[in-house]
Amino acid sequence: DPVLAGELVRKTEAGEEALPHLYIFGGGHVGKAMAAACALMPVHAVVVETRADELEGMAPGVATRLTPMPEEVVRAAPAGSAFAVLTHDHALDFLIVAEALKRDDAAYVGMIGSKTKKATFRSWFIKTAGGTEAEFSRLVSPIGGEAVKDKRPAVIAALAAAEIMTVLALHAAPARQ
């Protein structure tokens, strides 16, 4: 029945619009693993990359965005979005994370890396990028926590996906009440 089919399409599209947005910056090994994990989750996942070849082979159902200026994607993202930053370049990570932290409506801002990378980012963010301690305090780094020391991309991705889904569920909970 064409009428029922049309109604089903409208309901499906409305449901997808209501999903929280997760932007995965970086399409390397961890980015691909994160995209695969998030393809099964109730999120609108988008992998953002500056290198076209890294967008090949992404999980079905995950959107991709090729752009020379990933921080513009951060600016255009809807309120309540989550940002997971794991590019191939620390300087690029810093620019993207700084842009995300300037938004007070981001549900999650996470960056892959070590304690040293986080400390270096903090110094740059406060001294050079004009960030505040309050903004910096919202950064989750390393993504996925520190309890599990396994550095395999699939493990990092699974831990980070669980962390992000928890934050998104808590962020959405007040809206459901």
Cite the ranges covered by each PLM segment.
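Residues in the short beta-alpha loop(s) of Rossmann-like NAD(P)-binding domains
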Residues: 51-52, 115
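Segments forming oxygen-rich coordination pockets for charged ligands
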Residues: 1-50, 58, 163-177
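Short loop/helix-cap segments at secondary-structure boundaries that form the rim of catalytic
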Residues: 53-62, 76
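Short amphipathic alpha-helix with an adjacent loop that forms part of the alpha/beta core around
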Residues: 70-79
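Conserved SAM-binding strand-loop segment of SAM-dependent methyltransferases
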Residues: 62-68
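Structural motif
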Residues: 21, 81-83, 108
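ADP-ribose/adenylate-binding Rossmann-like module
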Residues: 88, 99-124
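Adenosine-phosphate binding glycine-rich loop
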Residues: 112-177
